[in-house]
């Protein structure tokens, strides 16, 4: 591998690591939820998102200067954006809880957050294999596993939204959780989009 190529894969690996940390921190926040401490939680969560933004800027600068890239620069740019979106959306879950002044956490939210940890763990494995995608014997199975987790999240979303509507007693609370669960679903979709991007790159370059 050319020395310059390693930058791209390392950058993606660092972003995937940040996503794993952010997802794990979200679970920690929800399992130990305290509305009086949510501003501090948001500050901590933002450090992960900000670090991911910096990695995206580094990628943009490198792509702008590069004469040759290991795969199409448009694909590298798209993947960088999609990884950043994962971090943005994980942070947004907590932001919405602050916006809607959520006082207690629904069990389904913790369940969803734990599935996001699983999705981000698989994403980290995919990115680790991506560096050697032409020889990897694991990458296809990992992409399938990522899709499986997204399907689990889809099922959880449908069940949770049904129960939320069926048991609704307060419009504001129902609307608040509706928006939060939408954000959880967007998170799981974003993880799958990264894995699909990797799959597309592999298909075009092997």
Q: Residues of each region from the PLM?
A:
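Cytosolic, long alpha-helical scaffolding segments
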Residues: 1-206
């Amino acid at each position: 591998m050319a020395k310059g190529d390693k930058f791209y894969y390392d950058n993606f690996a660092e972003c995937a690591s940040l996503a794993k940390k952010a997802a794990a921190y979200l679970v920690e926040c929800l399992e130990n939820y305290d509305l009086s401490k949510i501003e501090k939680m948001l500050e901590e969560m933002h450090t992960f998102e900000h670090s991911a933004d910096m990695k995206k800027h580094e990628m943009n600068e490198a792509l702008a200067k590069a004469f040759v890239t290991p795969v199409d620069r448009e694909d590298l740019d798209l993947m960088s954006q999609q990884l950043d979106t994962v971090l943005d959306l994980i942070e947004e879950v907590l932001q919405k809880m602050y916006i809607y002044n959520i006082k207690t956490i629904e069990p389904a939210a913790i369940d969803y957050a734990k599935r996001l940890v699983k999705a981000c763990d698989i994403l980290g494995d995919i990115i680790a294999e991506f560096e050697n995608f032409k020889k990897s014997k694991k990458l296809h199975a990992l992409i399938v596993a990522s899709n499986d987790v997204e399907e689990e999240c889809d099922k959880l979303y449908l069940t949770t939204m049904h129960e939320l509507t069926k048991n609704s007693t307060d419009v504001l609370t129902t609307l608040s959780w509706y928006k939060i669960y939408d954000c959880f679903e967007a998170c799981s979709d974003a993880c799958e989009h990264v894995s699909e991007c990797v799959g597309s790159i592999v298909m075009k370059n092997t």
